[in-house]
Amino acid sequence: RGLINSPFIVINGDDFYGLDTYQVIYDYYKNGGNDFSMVAFQLGKTLSEFGSVKRGLCTVKNKQLQTVVETGDLEKSLTGIKSDRDIQLNGSEPVSMNVWGFTPKIFTYLNSMFNDFLTSNVEEPTSEFLIPTVVNSLISSNEEKVRVLNTESSWFGVTYKKDKDYVRKRLKRL
């Protein structure tokens, strides 16, 4: 805080997002975008062949993020994609893989919300302060809008040990 005075990106350090992902978020801010942003991936391009995963399933309206709902036990099945929720999924649904674009204004929100989080969770040492929770709160209170940017890139990362060979092969092809 105090050192960043322009839009910036927040990502998971152990995931690969593809060049297009960075290009779309860069272009958004270069071309005058002012809202917070998130790059959405297609659910089907983020699943593991070796087990179920958890993803932030997004509701989007007019390119604006409405909600991000953590959805677990996602995996391919004969009838589509199953999950821990009673919903129909076909793989084209937008999901958050934690590629966020923020302006420095986020630091004010994070400071306040993190202090509240610590106070509320003092007895819960395993609780986590999650960016999607912050974003959902800002959207539901109408304090911020989050522009959803789409990418054709395939996400990949090592969720399971068996994913390691696949990721190695993909990285060698770059």
Task: State each model region's role.
Residues R1:
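Short, conserved alpha-helix that lines the donor NDP-sugar binding/gating region
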Residues N5, G33-N34, E143-E144:
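Short, high-confidence coil segments that cap the C-terminus of an alpha-helix
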Residues F8-I9:
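Short aromatic/hydrophobic "clamp" motif used to bind/position activated sugar donors
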Residues G13-F16:
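The conserved acidic donor/metal-binding loop of glycosyltransferases
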Residues G18-W100, P104:
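Conserved core of the sugar-phosphate nucleotidyltransferase
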Residues K61, V68, E75-L174:
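Conserved alpha/beta core of the MobA/IspD/sugar-nucleotide pyrophosphorylase nucleotidyltransferase superfamily
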